[in-house]
């Protein structure tokens, strides 16, 4: 395990190494069982915005979900093939938000309505996106695939629709871990992403009441994540601010990115979910069949030859005693 004091030199080294790339830091105080995860995801959310041609409101809502899903990868074993799916189903105008993230820091997602109109509200005299209205009331579902057979699924009600609070509620209800979660996205006048990031603070068993109270007061006094990023603060700086006077130590790093592993074989497999007759009907009406990936927008095109491939597949299944589709 990487263990380094979060000194000025270490912070400089991190800045020199990651530069403008997105990444997550994991930090702990020297003497208390507390974990702090801080992620910068500006480029990742901007990639999602461009892929899905998101409106500013959709960018902020989906961006928060992306940041939240990346923070939730703290539940996964680092560097493995474990992954999780975060699904927000509200009755607001954006519809369903789906984000998938894995233990290697790769994330992808999509929203029901990428062109949702702008909804704003006044907060301390400043105009902010009204994410709660964009999302609406509904449920938050987290599906963890730990590579152990059946995935673990948890569903909790959305308590605010602001996404950060909803994730904290999920962690408390489903993981029995008291947590503070902050997620934020700031967009430029042209709709592009200026800042996106967030943090997750968890107090584990054995944390003293004094430290719990100190952390609670400190977190309540922190400015929004995007304001800290606007001041030039990087993930390690925010971690140090949260763990100030607790001898913060760096114990983990992870680069994050928008990544979709879809390919032609995966797309073809989705066609094979159709029966041979359904494929025949499809190609009687169309010269080519198109399969579009919801996560990245790639389009895969197939001709009638897939019908013969489907027949061959069914023939092999029959020979092996498997049930045909």
Swiss-Prot record:
Function description: Redox regulated molecular chaperone. Protects both thermally unfolding and oxidatively damaged proteins from irreversible aggregation. Plays an important role in the bacterial defense system toward oxidative stress.
Protein name: 33 kDa chaperonin
TM helices/strands, residue ranges: none
Main location: cytoplasm
One BP term from GO: protein refolding
Example of a GO MF term: protein folding chaperone
Cystine connections: 260-262, 293-296
GO cellular component labels: cytoplasm
Subcellular location field: Cytoplasm
Keywords: Chaperone, Cytoplasm, Disulfide bond, Redox-active center, Zinc
Source taxonomy: Bacteria, Pseudomonadati, Aquificota, Aquificia, Aquificales
The record's account of how the chain is modified after translation: Under oxidizing conditions two disulfide bonds are formed involving the reactive cysteines. Under reducing conditions zinc is bound to the reactive cysteines and the protein is inactive.
Record Gene3D superfamilies: Hsp33 domain, HSP33 redox switch-like
Alphabetical list of InterPro entries matching this protein: Heat_shock_Hsp33, Heat_shock_Hsp33_C, Heat_shock_Hsp33_N
Family designation: Belongs to the HSP33 family.
